[in-house]
């Protein structure tokens, strides 16, 4: 008879009959193996028992784990303390032999929260007789009920399990596995996951610190309770509050938790597990350098004003050229056409009159606009300081019939000095008068120099010793008589003549610059007209071409004199005096826009407009445009100013003729 001992118990072939069950004996044999005893034939037969292969689909077993004693405690096996109870549908097997403690031990553990483990849906590769099998597990925690009678304590199967579990019989090795089924390797956890499982590991809600000396997933006989005191660290450990990663609801104790393989998130249900997904962050591409910006780096994101969207840049070096482009575009967009000078520039002033906004590019244009429209501002005329009320600035200066307000007396004094400096500048008529007077004196002096040269050449040789020639010149204007004694050596006479000749040549060159009168054909005018040419065209308006055989174009259309007439909505007819026809280019031009207009316009460019099919529409649209109206105002104002200046010049010319008759008397002695 073969024997083996387990902690003082001798096990023989009759041990199963004495214990009443093969499972009891098998569990005792496992205990023997775990403590280093060699396996006996009874255990071998138990492991190779056909009971294991009878039913591969066993119900899920709930294993209630109670605080185990320390590893060094002696194992006391007593037949009275081993009670086996299973569900009604479960067959006793060596693989599932479980021995609960006595009711006295359970009563001593009252107050310690026990945990219920449901093994389901986790695939572990285990070896049984050389064959590999896979299973899955999830863990459900619960509070088992403790009753006074031990025969009422049983194990029940879980209705939530989707697959059955089979555990291979292996030698019990305390310290090999922890409660959650993780292997201890060199004092560390090493969790094995199945690659095909959609739930990789189980959630654990530890209420008490587990001792690493118990393998809760291996068949083991629960020993008699020993006095066990937890350490201070174990007493201070508190369960962490765990919530569902999707719905953020807290996971209660006893609730099934789900976890995806390779993820640390826990879920309360499969619905939350399937609905929760981590989308991969797409790499953003920089606008300038076209590089994929890493998500870990802080990218520079700026809004685009035009689209109100955001653009990402890999670094500030990419941002700098883009900012420069935006600044250039912004500067172009901010430019508008000035109402006064018609230049495309940055607008500095905007004036709204009768719901019409007038844009002005500079202070000079703004002052012109104010004077033209009679606007008065509550600010100092000199420094521009704002005065909130009219009573603030009592310093008022009347200049040219207009009241100008100043903030202080110093501004008035500076403004007066500035006006005096401007008044010292000669007007155009005074400049012309002074130039004419200078020319007359030059001519007379040039003639006198020639006379002196002739006299010097006719002097006899005996008088060559004379070193000096005394010349007395008396000249005066009105009652003023100037006497000069000029000593001219013979060598200086030629220098004087050359100087006068150069002055006359410069004067003739200046006179040659003055352009001649332009022709009446606008097609022959230069692209840019100077001030004198423009004044000439304003004073002498070119006539409109009439009674002319206008040529036809390729479509058989031609210009007609009817375009010179505009029919108003009330039926009245007016003449378009600004419309000019060019016989050289067979096109029409706008006189006002040609003289004062800027920008692109069919009626002011070099070739003019020759779209005879749509000319009526073009003319109607053009004469109602803001640019044409402004140019017509400038034309009328310049024409009136030229008329006034012409009258003034005529009066000044008469005065000059009278002064000329009084003349300048030159006396040569």
From Swiss-Prot:
Keywords: Isopeptide bond, Metal-binding, Nucleus, Repeat, Transcription, Transcription regulation, Ubl conjugation, Zinc, Zinc-finger
Organism (species): Homo sapiens
Function: Functions as a transcriptional regulator.
Major location (coarse): nucleus
Segments forming MYM-type zinc fingers: 265-299, 311-351, 358-393, 404-431
GO terms for biological process, alphabetical: negative regulation of transcription by RNA polymerase II
Name of the featured protein: Zinc finger MYM-type protein 5
GO cellular component: nucleus
InterPro entries: TRASH_dom (IPR011017), Znf_MYM (IPR010507), ZnF_MYMT-QRICH1 (IPR051284)
Cell compartments where the protein resides: Nucleus
Source domain of life: Eukaryota
GO terms of molecular function: zinc ion binding
Placement of covalent cross-link Glycyl lysine isopeptide (Lys-Gly) (interchain with G-Cter in SUMO2): 88, 91, 134, 149, 166, 225, 443, 455, 462, 552
Subunit comment: Interacts (via N-terminal 120 amino acid region) with ETV5 (via C-terminal).
